Structures are given as structure tokens and as C-alpha cells.
Amino acid sequence: MGGSQLKNLKAALKANGLTGQTNVKKSSKKKGKSPREFDREERQKTIERIREQFNPFDVKTNRNKKVGVMRESAAKLAVGKPGITKQAGEDQRKMFYEAKKSSKNRSGGVLDKRFGEKDKNLTSEEIMLERFTKERQRQSSTKRSLFNLDDSDGGEDENVYGEKLTHYGKSLSLEDDFDEGDLGLQHSDSEDFRLKQAGKRNMADQYGDEGLGDDALQEPARKKTKAEVMQEVIAKSKFYKHERQKAQEKLVQDIEGLDDDFESIMSELRTLPKTKPSQTEISTSTDIAPDYDIKVKELVLEKRAAPADRTKTDEEIKKEYEDKQKELEQKRLDRMNGIFNIEDQKDAGVEDLGEEFWEDSDSEEGEYGEYIKAIPDSDDDVDFEKDNNDDNEYDATSNGRPSARVIPSVPCPQIHDDLLNFLKSYPIEEHPSLVKRIVKTYQPKLAEGNKEKLGKFTAVLLRHILFLAEEDYSVNVKEIASLQNELVSILKTLSEKFTIPLSEDCRNIISDIQTRFKESQFYGLSPSDLVFFSVVGMLFSTSDHYHLVITPCLLLIAEFLEQIRFNSLQKLIFGSILVRIAIQYQRISKRYIPELTYFLQTSLRSLIPSTKGETLENKEKQEDNLSIVGSDINWSKVAPSLELHSLFSEDLEKQESIKLSVLVNNLESIDWCITNIWKDLTAFPEIINPFKDILNVAAEVYPGTSKPKQLVEKIEKLLKFQERLPLTLQQHKPLAIPSNTPKFEENFNPDKKSYDPDKTRSELNKMKAQLKKERKFTMKEIRKDTRFEARQGIEEKKKEYADYHSKMARIVNQISTEEGAEKNKYEREKKLRNTKR
């Protein structure tokens, strides 16, 4: 079909006689029906056929995949119109939606029409009484008359089915409730009551009071009518309500009367003279007060007896200790592998402090004597070992005579300057004892606020240790070293109790070190920074996967080892000590640090002189004159340890022994890394090959030492067992190509879906397939209904919003019109007034 869509449509309409010349003059002789004149139905069918031809997407043909090639022409193809079907479904859904919307809140609801259900002013008795009254009225007017023509027969307390009505297990019979005369009712309105009273008076006048016996006075019992019963019930209810109202009014009046008399009573009480206590009463009270205070203090200081635990055997104690060690080791391994138990973490601090940090805190003995013993132990108390001798240090001298210097009060320094001012008047040997005395004096159990003071003092003590590292102590090295060790021991004990303030101060120190390094590079660092890294490694866990103090320290050490240009002996010593600290950090977790490998290679190339086969890199390193030249070196006297106090000495470059110590120290570091960390890595050959070449040169240059040769032999031995295999794909068992003989069905039927000989199983599978199909269709319809309801809801909301806005606009326009009219009216009146003037 060529041409445009419009031309084709016109041609099709013209070919079917639907368009063309229509004003041709018809012959009057020809009265038969023209072949071009169609009925309305035929015309509509033709239009539908043309519409389908020009709208192929409105028709969908479903082909049967099971129909063979030979039967394809004979098969009838299923033709559907999805557009029309969809529109019909939309119309049907809209009809159901409108019906559901119209019946909303109109059917299926339960309306509580019980009397007094939501009335808060009625009591439960009044509600039940009124319900009973209405029920009896309803029964008497409707159902009762259906079964009994005489309403007066039978009991009034029975319902239409002959059942007696009860309330709380008691009969609802009203015959005797109103004969006792306790209601105070006015019966003058009742005609029967007046006749009864008149009859009684006449009989009394005729026979006298004595002549009437009980039998004569008593009239035969007459059953009350329903109107009388209802009247008495209502009267009784009103009577009780009136009594309650009277009681409430009386209570309110009494309260108001007391309020009115309150001021007069108080004024009379104020006019009374005040009596002073006698001297005897004062003396007795003063005599009792001291005894009372003594008793209170005794009760405060009296230690309450705790229940004694069963004495454990040695096996139980040993087992508990082993279990505790296993638990702590498992926790450490979890932290090292980055496994954190969020539920068990109580604080978001540096470490998760458990109960083991706060148990077994015994009371201290010191300058407070028995008073401290009597105070219960606190969880935050700090316990030092071997403190008994330290407490008596200030009480007597070495020869047994009393000491002339006694410390009456010990301050708790909160900044480092205060601690220096306190310690400057005492010799260095007494500083640890003074620090212990400060800690014991300000135990948290002694006063409120001591815990915060000791937390700050812990950070001050760390600052003091770093301050000692900055001082020049080349003269008294042993005394300063002993002092630092004792202070570090005290700091470690304090760190177990005051971890959070100590960790915060450590992070501040780390930030300060990094700032100084960024500003001045290596020259902004100091020996105290090395001491800080070393002390931190002893205070905190270095094997954790992430730690708030250790992890920043490791990053800072790696930054120093990578960015500092090690072109002087002073820098090499600094880097060697950093390597030792980093190795100490990784003694348990055994993680690889690439910056450490880089520094060890750089330091060895700087210290070992090159041979004839030197490289360009070795030549550049020789310019710094750091290499150790000489074959007559006494290697047995070379110490691998490096002294921190000699790091910044002036004659450092002249000391060849320090260079030898640095070289031996680096060789020891390489040996430790190979043995504990590098050998287990898959990249061990790539890491160790540069060291192998350098160590071979060192073995040639320094034949007097066997350390380089031993390292080379160890490397070669490890490389033999280090098998390197290229990456390969995963091995799978080869799958054979299936070679099955084609299976033909002799009695093949394309309409038959199953060839199962078991009829029961076949029917069951058929039922399952049908159920699955129906379920799928139902879910599809439910989704369509849900989407349709959502669209309808959106349209309704849009319509509501549009109506609201149009209504508001109409109101605003109306108000504006009225305002304008009033304004014009006012202007006209104003103009008229002005013209009259």
C-alpha cells in the first residue's frame, strides 16, 4: 500500500462507496435499491474493517506454537483486540469503583444505639435502670400483646418467653420495693391512692382504731399497673439523684465556709505571743546532739558485712584463669581482624572497658589511716604495687629519726606547669613517690570530683614524661632513665582507669606533631615524639584493626618514613628508631608496612659503600658521605641499641660507632621482619630481592661480620620454598556433549499436553497448572485494580484542589467587588459632601 496514510484512507473509503459524488440526479423511473446504497449495519461493518486495516496495533493475533508446518494454513488463529478489552476493563472498574464509593460508610458498620453509652454524666446504675425501663416499655407495647390478650396476667418481671429478668443475680420484681414508704413520694395525684386513703379513714371513724384488726386494715393485694411502676421507678431515680446533688452542695458550702474563716483563724494565731524554749530544753538538746552525731558517723564508717563466697579449689581457680585468658585472647583477635561487637560496647571511647578493669580494688592505707579503710572501695580507685614503703618515705629518714620535711597537703596538678612547680623543690629520686602520693590522696572514693581530677592528671603525667625526654640528661642518664620507667609504670596503671581523657590528650599530641612536621619537616620534630610513640605502644592495644590512638600513630610514622629525605646520620637514627617502634606495634598483628621496607633499603644504600658494580642510585647516595669505610672494624663491640639522648648532639657526624650501631640495628630489623612478617606474604620474592643484592655487597665490604651472610642464606632458603604459580582458571570436569537418540511419539497429539500414564498424577498436575494460571491472572487483576484506584484517587484530589481554588478565587473576587462598590460609594458620598461645602 503505497502513498501516504491519508491518501490510502481516502482511496479505501472511495472504493467502498463511502465517499464520492453524492449530488447526482436520480432517475425517477428507477425505483429499485442501488447497489451503492448500504444499510446502516453494512456501512458500520465496512468502516470497522477499514479502521482495522489502518490501525494494525489494535488487533493482536496469537499463534499456536504447537501447530505444525503442515497444519499452519488450516489452523484458526486467535484474534484479539487489546485496546477494546482494556477500555472495557477500565469501564467495568470505574463502575465498581463508583459503587464502592457510594456505599462507603453506609453498610457493614456497627452503630451503638444503647442508651447512655457515651453519656459521662450518668452513673452505671442510672444507665442500667434507664435501659431496663425502655426495654420493659418496648416489650409491653409490642411483643407482650402478641402472645397474651390480658396484660395483667402473669408476673410483671417476666419477659415474653416466660423468663424472669435478673440484675446482678437478683430478681427484678418491683412488687415490694415501693410499699415501705421510704421514698417520700407525693401520691396525691393518684386517684386510686386518694380513694384508698378515704376508705381507710371512713372505716376508722365507724369502728375505731381498735376495732380494726390487721386483717381488716389490710386490703387485698392489687397488682400495680405499668404506668404506676414506671412512675415510681422514675420518681426513685430522681430522688436518688436529688440526694446526691444535696450532698455535693453541702460539701461545697462547707469548703467555702472553711476558706472564708481561714484568714480570721490565721490572724488570731499571729496575735499569740511566741514562747521561747526553756533553758532546760536547750541544755538537753545540746547534750543529745553530740551523741547523735557520733552515732551517725559510726553508722557511716561501719562497713557492712558482705556475704562470704565459697572457697574455690586450686583447680577451679586455675580453670577460671585459663577461661579468662582465652576470652581476652579471643577479644583481641576479633579486634585485630576488625570484628566489633556493637551490642557489647558500652562507650564509644578508645577501648571497650569491661568489668575486668574495675574489679579487685582494695582500700588504700596511707596518711588517712583507718578513715580510708572504713570507706567502701570505689571502682575507679588506683592500686599500686609495693606502695607500703613509699607511704612511709616522708615519715622517717633512713636512720630512723623523724624527717624534718613533711608534706601536709598534696595538690593535684591539672596542667603541666603546676606539676613542675610542685616537683622542682624535691630531688629526682622522690618524684615517683610524690606522683604516687598525689594519686592516692585524690582517690575517687575520697571526694566528689576526684575522678575528673585524676583523669586530667593522667594527661599531665604523660606531658611530663615527654618533657623529660626534651631535657639534656647526658650527664645523669641512669637517673633520668629510671625516673622515666617508673613514671611510665604509674601512667600505665592510671591508663587502665582513665582511658578516655588520656586518649583525647594523645590525639591532641598527634595533631600537634603533624602540624609541626608540615611546617618545618624533619626539623620540627623532637626526641619527645619518639618517646610518645613508644609510650603509646605500651599503653594501648597495638593489634586492633582500628584504634583511635594507635592507627593515627602508625599513619604518622609511615608519613615520616616516606617523606623525610634521609641524607644525614641524624635522620637515619630517627628513622631507625621509628622502624623499631613500628615493628613493636606489629609484633602480634604482623601487618606489612611498605614505608618500613623503603626506609630499610634507603638506609642500607646510604651506609654500605658501593663496589665496582655500583649503580647510579648508589652513586647519588655516596655524595652524602654516610658510608662506613674500613675493614678493621671490631664488630663484637658494636651495640645494636641506639641512645636517644645522643640523637641531637653536635659531634654526631664524627662518631663512626653510631653509624655502625645504626647499620647493625637495621640488619636486626630486617632479620626480624623476614622471620615474622615477610616470609608469609605472597609477594615475598618481590619484597626481598632488593635486599638480597644490598646484603651481598655488604658481605663483600664487611668480611668481619657474618650477619649479612646469614641473612642472604636465610633469604635463599626461603626463596626455594616460595613456589610462584601463574594465575589459572578454575579447573572443572569436562562435560560430554549429549548424544541421545531423538524420541518420537507414535500417537502424537498436539492438543495433548501430558503423556503421563498415571491418571491421578496427571489430573493433579493439571489442577496445579490451572491453579497457578488462575492465581497469576488474579494477581494481575488485583494490581490493575490497585493502580486504577490510585489514579482515581489522584484525579479526585486534583478535582478537589481545583474546586477549592476556584471557590477561593470566586470568594476573593466577590469580596473585591464588594470592596470596590463600597469604595466607590464612599468616594461619591465624600464628593457630595465636598460639593455641598
From Swiss-Prot:
Matching InterPro entries: Nop14
The keyword Nucleus belongs to this UniProt entry's keyword annotation: yes
Top-level taxon in the UniProt lineage: Eukaryota
GO CC term, one of those recorded: nucleolus
Disordered: annotated segments: 1-45, 131-162, 204-228, 373-406, 738-761, 815-837
GO molecular function, one term: snoRNA binding
Compartments reported by the entry: Nucleus, Nucleolus
Record keyword Nucleus present: yes
Biased composition (Basic and acidic residues): 34-45, 743-761, 820-837
Pfam families xrefs: Nop14
Gene Ontology BP, a term: ribosomal small subunit biogenesis
UniProt function note: Involved in nucleolar processing of pre-18S ribosomal RNA. Has a role in the nuclear export of 40S pre-ribosomal subunit to the cytoplasm.
Subunit structure: Component of the ribosomal small subunit (SSU) processome.
Protein name: Probable nucleolar complex protein 14
